[in-house]
Amino acid sequence: MSVIYLDNNATTKVDPDVVEAIMPYLTDYYGNPSSMHTFGGQLGKAVRTAREQVAALLGADESEIVFTSCGTEGDNAAIRAALLAQPEKRHIITTQVEHPAVLNVCKQLETQGYTVTYLSVNSHGQLDLDELEASLTGNTALVTIMYANNETGTVFPIEEIGKRVKERGAIFHVDAVQAVGKIPLNMKTSTIDMLTISGHKIHAPKGIGALYVRRGVRFRPLLIGGHQERGRRAGTENVPGIVGLGKAAELELIHIETAIKKETRLRDRLEQTLLAKIPDCEVNGDITQRLPNTTNIGFKYIEGEAILLSLNKYGICASSGSACTSGSLEPSHVLRAMGLPYTTLHGSIRFSLCRYTTEAQIDRVIEVMPEIVERLRALSPFKNDEAGWLQAQEQTLAHR
């Protein structure tokens, strides 16, 4: 049974061309790029080429690219750098729907005397820019907001946000881990000061990422040690990972226009067909301002985990919109922030496509999903009894 992988917002397949580019740096070219000898110099050249490739994808200058180990490091580095550069300012603005790499840092900073404003979202997952405007003060050091939400695909009006942030003199950081390769970017004309990307979301290996730091932005490094990355990120460079990220960035730039069209068409077909065939389901998130590859659908009166287990039997990989873990039945913080009813929250499934997704794969999901939902609803003691479902959820949460 072949795998149908529709969980690309979690991670992506490494492109074969990326694997080919990496291999020599795992076998033949193993020197240290900081070394003075020719062998090390070859590695230094490879790192410079990759930096240029990443810069081209972002519409940035290569001197503005700092290689990191992942998106989480990039987010941490950007947030800490912004605060260290402005020690007199103690206020941060973010949103309720950020990735934990941002939210948990902000929560920790609250214990260190910082004040954090968590902007709300509406039922479509969009921000109220008037709330942002009212939250900005002269004490605001940093505004950190994701470009696109990883669960719903909702895209925020980043340039409008950035314009308001810059008018108030704060640093603007954007977690673009989900946006890069799915939305064309041009940092040369952007209001963004710092921007995070992660390799494994764009068909590069895990363990490599990059942080864009606009020229002129004061930057204090998170990792202290050697002189690597022009003193902005200490530690011997992960050359194979960097080469892989560079190649992946080059490929994303080549394929982005055709990928957007293909993914949008396949996503819309999947979404519209499931909505037509399955009663009591709805799309979670903004259906106009969103990533081309992402749909999050709530199937009422059943658990998302049960849907995922059923899909898994057919070799179909997706993700639950519910962040349920052992011992907890609380759904994802993103969907809760949107104010969705429990009947939808718990049965939400995210399908996230990529340029490798095929028509036949979408056909297969369309074929099996109606039967899965019908069977699970038949097993549910509540079926379409919304009051009974809500009562059961309240009782469960009351005994946690």
From Swiss-Prot:
Catalytic activity line of the entry: (sulfur carrier)-H + L-cysteine = (sulfur carrier)-SH + L-alanine
Superkingdom assignment: Bacteria
Signal peptide limits: none
InterPro entries per the UniProt record, alphabetical: Aminotrans_V_dom, Aminotrans_V_PyrdxlP_BS, Cys_deSase_NifS_bac/arc, Cysteine_dSase, PyrdxlP-dep_Trfase, PyrdxlP-dep_Trfase_major, PyrdxlP-dep_Trfase_small
Binding-site residues for [2Fe-2S] cluster, renumbered to this chain: 324
Molecular function terms from GO: cysteine desulfurase activity; iron-sulfur cluster binding; metal ion binding; pyridoxal phosphate binding
E.C. designation(s): 2.8.1.7
Enzyme class: transferase
Family: Belongs to the class-V pyridoxal-phosphate-dependent aminotransferase family. NifS/IscS subfamily.
Quaternary structure and partners: Homodimer.
Function: Catalyzes the removal of elemental sulfur atoms from cysteine to produce alanine. Seems to participate in the biosynthesis of the nitrogenase metalloclusters by providing the inorganic sulfur required for the Fe-S core formation.
Annotated protein name in UniProt: Cysteine desulfurase
Organism name: Nostoc sp. (strain PCC 7120 / SAG 25.82 / UTEX 2576)
Gene from which this protein is expressed: nifS
